[in-house]
Amino acid sequence: MHIKQTRKCVACRESKHQNEMLRISRVNNAFQLDITHKMGGRGAYVCKDKKCIDLTIKKRLFNKSFKSNLEENIYMLLEEYEKNN
């Protein structure tokens, strides 16, 4: 039996296949942008859609997901990704 790998976006709350999303991973209290979806640790997802990325950056939605304040560089990485794609 094949299991669908769907995840919920922190911004729009829609469930989509994880390949359509960006993942932020927390491993040993260090946060990283996980493009390959292969890092271990706790993760949270955002759609690759511009609106979702903008809302996530504006409202710092990953802080709520991880119940912790993320370093500013994570949100800067999201901005970079958005500009380049």
Which stretches of residues belong to each language-model region?
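Short linker/helix segments within small regulatory modules
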Residues: 27-42
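Residues immediately within or flanking Cys/His clusters that coordinate Zn2+
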Residues: 6-9, 44
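N-terminal cysteine/histidine-rich coordination modules
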Residues: 1-2, 8, 22
